[in-house]
Every structure is written in structure tokens, then in C-alpha cells.
Amino acid sequence: MTCSVFIGTSLDGFIARPNGALDFLPMDGGEPHGYSEFFASVDALVIGRKTFETVLAFVEWPYGNKPVIVLSAGQLDFSKLRDAKVEQMAGPPAEIVAKLAARGFQHLYVDGGITIQEFLRAGQIQRLTITRVPILIGQGIALFGTLPHDVKLKHIETKQYVSGLVKTEYQVVG
């Protein structure tokens, strides 16, 4: 099982403003940055409750018919989602990954600040793709939290785009 992160941040490392707003991230869909290819490579998404609630406010469900697993111990309401494949799970990251692997999933897209941090701390992330937006927002929700130990990364590739975005891919090696 491979667990990957594909996320955008401000240059100062924030994935959202303090109130969760994503207005500093380009959403125009203009210049391709590899997201479509990445998304096509994953079997399912694992997101946290806050990310799920943010996505519910979008005009369209962005995940199509890909299975989405929402991590939450509390009850969630999926009634607004008609054709989406959404389910709820709870538990430690290693347990979630094992359960999904047993169901035949091979590549998970892990998204959402707290969820990414928990999976990284548990050693469940194998690949990180981080696209930095050329803006400093000064405060917000950080991509990375505290870690029990260093996480060594191997640089795979960096691409710079005309828009000023810089996408870097890393393999987690320890």
C-alpha cells in the first residue's frame, strides 16, 4: 500500500488561513500542475472531518466516483451526497491503512492538515508532493506539526511553473 500527499501551501508553509479559507490557492484550473495525473493514480482518498466539511461547501463534489474515507469518531451526515462513494472510519493510521489494503486498495491519497500530520507521525506516508504558492500569508494552518523524530526525505523532482508555483516531490525514506 502506498499513501501519498498532494497539497498546496503558501511559501511560509500554511495550507489554509486560520479560519480554514483557501482563497490564496489558485483555483482557476489554468496551468496543469500534475494533479489530474496524480488523482488518476489513486484508488481512494482518506480525509479528515474538517477537510470533508470544507469540500462539502464546494459547488461540485471534487472527487467524482473515487471512494472517499472520512476519518471521524463522531457521526457524520452523508445525506447531501448523492452519487459519491463516501464512508466513515476511525482508528489509528496503521489500522486504517491495513483495513483498506485488505479491501484491495493499493494507492491512497491522504489529505487534510491533521490527517496528513497523523499519518506522517505514524510512518504511513510514502510520498509527498508539495506545491508552493508564491505568497506569504503570515499565519494559518501549518502543513506539518510536531514529529516524534526526524522524517528523512529523498528529493524526486522539482518543477517550476510560469505562474510562479513550485512543485516538489519527495519519497519518505525514514
Where are these regions (language model features)?
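Enzymes that bind and transform nitrogen-containing heteroaromatic metabolites
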Residues: 1-174
